[in-house]
Amino acid sequence: IFCQLTAANPTLVKNTLQRVLKQSNMSARLAQDKNQTIDVNAQLKLRKSVAAQEELYEGAVPIYNGIAILVHRPQLEQLDQATRYIETCFQRPAQVIRETEYAWKIWLQTLPIVWEGLLAKPFNRRQLYLTSEVPGLMPLVLPKKGDQEGFELITEEGGTPIHLDLFNQHKNLALFATTRAGKSVLVSGILTQALAHNIPIVALDFPKPDGTSTFTDYTEFMGKEGAYFDISKQSNNLFEQPDLHLLTPEQQQDRLLDYSAFLESALMTMVLGSSTDNKLLSQTIRSLLNLALTAFFADQTIQKRYQEARQEGLGSMAWQHTPTLKDFLRFCSHEHLLLESVGDRVEEALNYIQLRLRFWLSSRVGKAISAPSSFSSDAPLLVFALRNLSDNEDAAILSLSAYSAALRRALSNPASIFFIDEAPILFEFDQIADLVGRMCANGAKAGIRVILSAQDPDTIAQSKAASKILQNLTTRLIGRIQPVAIDSFVQILKYPREIIARNASESFFPRKEGIYSQWLLDDQGVYTFCRYYPGYEQLAVVANNPQEQTARQKAMQHYNDKYEAISVFARQLVASLRGG
């Protein structure tokens, strides 16, 4: 859109307005005297000319305004459609006219190197406005800009870029959308940019029953940059300490206290699960676990084993002897706790702790978190797969294992991302909801950016830490939702019904022909409807339909270079999407 402003001669404009005023006044009188009728057009011109002259005498300046809209399309049919659409955007008396005779000349007039005024020649097609009216016609009105850089979305109105800077600023992000609404594609775009900014990521993934998901292929494509944790094949030591050797002794002490507090919450979940009926037993168990953790980390043998494992590194003999849950279990006894007197309640609590922890040591999930870590936690992208779990407790404990990895990352890096995908099960456990709430509320101190993905806000709102989580998810992206979920967004997140109802319409699904998904961006209470256009190669990496996965696998086998293979498959995928 090009807009050229040229000052007009105020004297000529005043004379013209006076002539219009006289003519309109005369026409109105003649209509009334001869026909006993009212000349509406003459009276309208009369009022407008009087108002314009009033503004001129008060200091307004007349300005010629030449506006041209240049439309580019690769094909003539697309150009016709685009111009017709633009014409329909303007209601009478405003009018947009498509130039078909000398469009080349108008294009030439828009160039800054051409002296000729826009729409001034060969015919003067400029419109005359006053200074109070011109700003409304200038192409200055844009959707409110967010951050200066970051993850890019395109606004639906105006088509201008709007950014979310999760990489240089601390922001927690919530993503709400139904299945097949483009959530995973958008998240992969955010995570890719985070990796480019050297920000480590810990993600919780809920794969399909066959073990495949968006992030299995994505992590595999990342090669050494990614690590996919599967409980059936690998282990992640819950008691692995963060690497704090670069910090001061005082900072090390503070970080260890934070990590001990996390372990206490994790052990409470393992021992009590989601049951909190017996508060007295719960308090006794928490007290005993706290004492046991203090004795555990104060033991010189334990400290020496931690130090040797850290020095020799992953895969060494010392690493295989790093302290784990098995070692901690020995400290949950009378001998290590040094209790002067033991009542029935304490005895019952100790027996219960021993029983539950022994159960976890014998379970599949428990074995995965009670053995030395079998993969390097230095991989920038670390994905935990929550699959083949026998019950909700397994999911909760495995998520705690992922949380421990996220906490280790946070204590060792200035910025990190913790992403939870489809996590309704986890918020049924008070301890886990508390941990996520604590991370949302206090994660800024450790540089943790929390990204939550769900289909609706119900499960989050019903959790114990709902207020901590929802109040600190200051940035939200809402895609296509189910019509039955509208009430949840209105009641829980306080969205105006007329705004959020648009997200439940059929037209809000991702547009395959345009290769984009549609989103409502809520950034600090400012609502903007946006589109996300993924890179074709980005889309090719995370496409997870069975047919798409098969085609991608064939391309990867055919080409030695994985980037060339993805590029070829991307072109095939885009062609198939646009072809329907």
Label the predicted regions.
Residues H197-I199:
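Conserved SF1/SF2 helicase motif Ia
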Residues I1-S132:
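Extended, folded cores of ATP/NTP-driven motor/assembly subunits in large transport
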Residues N65-I67, K171, P380-L382:
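Short amphipathic alpha-helical segments
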Residues L173, P249-Q307, I460, K464-G580:
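P-loop NTPase motor core of the ASCE superfamily
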Residues I106-P161, F206-P209, T216-M222, K233-I448, ...:
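P-loop NTPase motor domains
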Residues V20-A51, E240, L244-Q253, E308-G315, ...:
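Flexible coil/linker segments and helix-coil junctions enriched in charged and small residues
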Residues V61-I63, R73, T88-Q95, T100, ...:
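Short flexible coil/turn linkers enriched for glycine and charged/polar residues
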Residues A28, G158-P161, L166-A181, V185-Q193, ...:
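Conserved P-loop NTPase motor cores
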